[in-house]
Amino acid sequence: MSNTDKERAIAAALAQIEKSYGKGSVMKLGQRPNIDIEAVSTGSLGLDMALGIGGVPKGRIIEIFGPESSGKTTLTLHLIAEAQKKGGTCAFIDAEHALDPAYAKKLGVNIDELIISQPDTGEQALEITDTLIRSGGIDMVIIDSVAALVPKSEIEGEMGDAQMASQARLMSQALRKLTASISRTNCIAVFINQIRMKIGVMFGSPETTTGGNALKFYASVRIDIRRIGSIKDKEEVIGSQTKVKVVKNKVSPPFKTADFDIMYGSGISKEGEIIDLGVKLDIVEKSGSWFSYNNVRIGQGRENVKQYLKEHPQIANEIEKIIREKSSKITNMNLDQMEEEND
């Protein structure tokens, strides 16, 4: 088979796959992201770029997972705040019964307009989710978390009763129902999930997420969020360094990464990301511990520069605008980073 015939055969196969399974189900890894898909910002400049379309896609299922206290709920609260800024209506299904309204408000969430439900069982939670999505008036629904979606049979049973795969069956059935409604209403469904360890794994990662495999298949975007370090002010811990990896992405090439700071009480540090991405793209100059922008020194030490940008929002916005214009370059840098890590 000649090269031309091969290219035609591949193009025909790709067209057939897209026709059968939808646009974005297959693409070349280095292909330009599909910019026609509507997106909602995550509140993180770096993560928006790693996702390839400027945020999470509308009309899709998103899974955010990671260890305890890694920033999963913080990230989803930022998502709600960004959706509300665009005039969207959001719902929070609090299966864990752990949402802190005061913290949500600090992150920019309009709690007066946020619809909240604290269901008793997994079936109730997913029925409420289904009803809200089918209404067509909800732009984003958060389910916190999959691990807390306990089936009714387990709640009504005795302690110690074996409920083999009942949660996995519940999730599989619910996602089959939800997928079409989510796509039709252009709603974003975000599932927060926890990590568990598989027993007896000799090779590969022993980590897995709760609720069976259905969510892994139905999710268009899966985001792995991890705490990689602490941010200290002298001896006091004031935040955590966070790394996110887009482990699945059906709307843009996957495996991109982003780093950001989560400051206790205020959420994702936009200023920290502007500094880091600005230095990567040579927009902000770094010489030793000094940082400069347009040949003017803006501070010594990263924390001091963050404070400077907070006090001078016009400079922060100016640098952010330039970073977004050069976002394609950042995408390539992330791919190069991944290649280096794999080598």
UniProtKB/Swiss-Prot annotation:
The keyword Flavoprotein does not apply. It is found in: Cytoplasm. CDD domains: RecA. Its main location: cytoplasm. The keyword Transport does not apply. GO terms for biological process: DNA recombination; DNA repair; SOS response. One of its GO terms (molecular function) is damaged DNA binding. It holds the Pfam family RecA_C. SUPFAM superfamilies: P-loop containing nucleoside triphosphate hydrolases, RecA protein, C-terminal domain. InterPro entries: AAA+_ATPase (IPR003593), DNA_recomb/repair_RecA (IPR013765), DNA_recomb/repair_RecA_CS (IPR020584), P-loop_NTPase (IPR027417), RecA-like_C (IPR049261), RecA-like_N (IPR049428), RecA_ATP-bd (IPR020588), RecA_C_sf (IPR023400). One of its GO terms (cellular component) is cytosol. Keywords: ATP-binding, Cytoplasm, DNA damage, DNA recombination, DNA repair, DNA-binding, Nucleotide-binding, SOS response. ATP binds at residues 66-73. Belongs to the RecA family. HAMAP family: RecA. Can catalyze the hydrolysis of ATP in the presence of single-stranded DNA, the ATP-dependent uptake of single-stranded DNA by duplex DNA, and the ATP-dependent hybridization of homologous single-stranded DNAs. It interacts with LexA causing its activation and leading to its autocatalytic cleavage. This is Protein RecA. It comes from Rickettsia canadensis (strain McKiel).
